[in-house]
Each structure stands twice: as C-alpha cells, then as structure tokens.
Curated annotation (Swiss-Prot):
Gene from which the chain derives: FAM133A
Region feature Disordered, mapped onto this chain: 68-248
Protein family per UniProt: Belongs to the FAM133 family.
Transmembrane annotation, as ranges: none
Low complexity biased stretches: 103-118
Compositionally biased region (Basic and acidic residues): 68-80, 147-156, 163-175, 211-220
Name used for this protein in its record: Protein FAM133A
C-alpha cells in the first residue's frame, strides 16, 4: 500500500486574473467624466452677467443701509451734545449759588467772630488750668506706679530666687536617688519631701553596714561547707586506701 497523494495544484493568481479578462466596473468611469456635457461659451457669458446684476443689487441695498445708519448716528450725537451742554449749564448755576452762599456766610461770621473771640479766650484759660491739673495728677500717679512696680519687681526677684533654690535642692535629691537606684536597685526610693539629705546618707550607710555583715556571714557559711566537704573527701580517701592494702 502506497501513501495517499495529498498534493494540491498551485494556481498562479496573476495568470488566473489574465485568463479571466478585465473586470466589469460599477459606476461612471474616467471616460464618462471626460465625455460629460459641457456648456457653450454663450451660456457661460449669461451666467457671468447674472452674477454681476446680483452683486449690483446687493451693493445698492448696502448703500441704503449705510445712509440710514449715518442719519441715526447724527441724531444720537446731537442728543448727546445737547445733554452735555445742559449739564454744563447746571454746573455753572450751582457754582454761582455756592459763591453767593459763601459770601453771605462770611459776612455773618465776621460779626460773630468778635463775640466768639472773647469766649474762646476764656475757654482757653479754663482748658489751660485743666491741663495743668491733669499733668500734676498724672505725674503723681506715675510716681506711685513706679514705686509699686519697683516693689513688685523686688518681690518677684525674691520669689524667683526661692524657687531656684528649691528646684536646685530637688535636683540634688533626685540625683542622689538616681545614684542610689543604680548602686542599690533593690532598695525603695526615698521621697524628697519626707527625708532630707542627711537622713538619706545615714540610711545609705546603715544599709551598707548590713550588706557587709550579710556578705561576711555568707562567706563564713561557704567556708564551713568547704571544710565539711574536705573532711568527707579525706575520709573517703582513707577508706579507699585501707581497702586497697587489705586486698594486697
């Protein structure tokens, strides 16, 4: 049994296209565009004339509109100018009225000035006396305030010194308590309020003595234990040596 032939015939696409021939195009071709119907020269002239007449009508309409607009502009200008003239006239009238009122007030003030001058002198004298009294009062009050401020400053300085001394004492006690904690962590800290420095030192010395005594007692106990162990060890050696002699 031989193998099946699975080969397929190769078809050249270019050769197949040539064999099929030209394709039928859908829609107008280039030749149709070139052979389109075209207007004659006379028809073109008519179209140009129609365009010119249309532009003339538009130009006439624009000219009319411009004329109307110019007329409206002139009217509005006249109105504005007339309004400005009327406002300027009103201003001039107001100025004249003000001048007249100033003249009348100046004449009346000249008559009143003579009477008011005497009154003003009396008032100035009274005000001068009042100012002197106020100055004297302010000077006295300033002196009293300076004395009070000096006394207050002295008291504040004394209080600051006392507070500094107290803070320094507290710092010293705290530093001693910290040192005590570092050297003897098992001891309870003494409060700064209940114990002074001397009491604290006495307590520290007493505790040192107690600890020294405890250490000495512990050393003695260790020595006694070592002696007992040494005696036991020597007895065991003697027993071993005696048993060895008997065996010989």
């Amino acid at each position: 049994m031989g193998k099946r032939d699975n080969r397929v015939a190769y078809m050249n696409p270019i050769a197949m296209a040539r064999w099929r021939g030209p394709t039928q195009s859908v829609g107008p071709t280039i030749q149709d565009y070139l052979n389109r119907p075209r207007p004659t020269w006379e028809e073109v002239k008519k179209q140009l004339e129609n365009k010119k007449t249309g532009s003339k009508a538009l130009a006439e309409f624009e000219e009319k509109m411009n004329e109307n607009w110019k007329k409206e502009l002139e009217k509005s200008r006249e109105k504005l100018l007339s309004g400005n003239e009327s406002s300027s006239k009103k201003r001039e009238r107001k100025k004249k009225r003000k001048k007249k009122s100033c003249r009348s007030s100046s004449s009346s003030s000249s008559s009143d000035s003579s009477s008011s001058s005497s009154d003003s002198e009396d008032e100035e004298k009274k005000q001068g006396k009042r100012r002197k009294k106020k100055k004297n009062r302010s000077y006295k009050s300033s002196q009293s305030s300076t004395h009070e401020s000096e006394s207050e400053s002295k008291e504040s300085v004394k209080k600051k010194k006392k507070s500094k001394d107290e803070t320094e004492k507290e710092k010293d006690v705290r530093s001693l308590s910290k040192k005590r904690k570092k050297s003897y962590p098992d001891d309870k800290p003494l409060s700064s309020e209940s114990s002074s420095e001397s009491d604290y030192e006495e307590d520290v010395q007493a505790k040192k003595k107690r600890r020294c005594e405890e250490r000495e007692q512990a050393k003695e106990k260790v020595k006694k234990k070592k002696k007992k162990q040494h005696k036991k060890h020597s007895k065991k050696k003697k027993k071993k040596s005696g048993s060895s002699h008997k065996s010989r």
